[in-house]
Amino acid sequence: MHEIGVIHGRFQVLHNDHLAYLMDGAKRCRYLVVGITNPDPFLTAPDPSDPSRAAPENNPLTYYQRQRLVRAVLLEAFEENGCDPESFTIVPLPINRPELYRYYVPMDAVFFLSIYDDWGRRKRELFTSLGLCVEVMRDVSPWQKGLSATEVRGRMLRGEPWEHLTPPAAARLMKEWDVPGMLRRGGAASCCIP
């Protein structure tokens, strides 16, 4: 078991496979640092390996909302699994700005990664080029990936059931914030969400 692990994602929107990914990381270390990527427009950049990931329509939630989602979901899951709720923290992680990582995450941690496309391979190359210790938790083809946030957002846009694809805490918050309505209106998240 590693002392400290770093795991990351956009979580736009947080779904059941995100939770499985986060819990897999939590089982591999004593303390988990969850980096939320694309924290704001200034720290978000397109990457040729996945050009759509920086598009505003693919990043509807603010960092604050995603931090609340990740925290609520992990607290709920940790309680259900008998894990220490003090064994994780959540930070911004400007994934496209590796020169800034040291300001956000411990560079001597193990960086957990799932790979299923060119973007995952690009991140592995980026992390290893920085001399980071990388542990690939899963390396599968795109069609074996499973659930995607794009699919969940699409269901929200079309008014189809989506709640069963998200952890209960995430569904509660996204309903409270009317994320489906916000997506249908084509708007970004409200800055006034508590």
Give names to the regions the model predicted.
Residues 1-194:
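Nucleotidyltransferase catalytic core that binds NTPs
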